[in-house]
Amino acid sequence: MLENIRLSLQGIWAHKMRSFLTMLGIIIGIASILSIVSTIKGTNEQIKQNLIGAGNNVVRVQLYRTDYDYVYDIGNEGIPQGITPVDDDLYQDILDLPQVEDAALYTRRQYANPLYYGNKELSGCEVLGVDNAYFSTCRYTVDRGRTFVPADFQEFRPVAILDSDTAQLLFQGEDPIGKTIEYNGTALVVIGVVEEQNQFEPVINSLDDYYLYMSNFTAGKVFLPNAIWPSLFAYDEPQEVAVRAANTEAMSQVGTQVADLLNQQ
């Protein structure tokens, strides 16, 4: 054993350059493999963050057409038939699913009419009628004012909450709290401004990335109590469900389970 080690060391010493180049090749090879693995892992993480956002683990379950793979749009396709509201029992079934931390029901109109404040007009906002669990489920924080309280729903108060983008675009730095805006001929008092804790900012490297990740972005969001939604939009929009999963890995499973429950009603 010792003789073999001695002969090996003599061979290395006698061919120092060849031994050095061999060791260098091995080191470079290992470093290249580590670099490739790190690059692939980093790319996968970036794609995952682009597709699902970073940090809030929220899955949105929406009504899709069965013949085409896109979200149902009542503006182009009319009122869907046979879609019933989510009742209390079904909502509780959603909350009881494994890996579900919270859930909220909401209605949404993506291509809404313009929003007015005085002589200012803002187009392109998304309007949502939300329940009392929406802001906690989707990880919104209050920047100014407050969120909805039970009396806002029970008394059908004409109030609205803006996200920070809408507040900035419409009020240009002016404090919006207590101000009256107009939507669909209805006066709404702004009671709060909210921000998402983990805002989705995808990395855009190409035109294809832009269309993939930015096609559904709007000028901002306006939130209304779901109790007053019928007075502005009737009952046209089907309910959607926002579900916060326990972790990123559970999002796909949670989304599928919620969709299955909704399809069974």
What are these regions (language model features)?
Residues 1-30:
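N-terminal Sec/SRP start-transfer signal
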Residues 24, 107, 183:
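Residues that line or immediately flank small-molecule/substrate-binding pockets and catalytic motifs
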Residues 41-126, 169, 230-233, 249, ...:
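Hydrophobic, regular-secondary-structure patches
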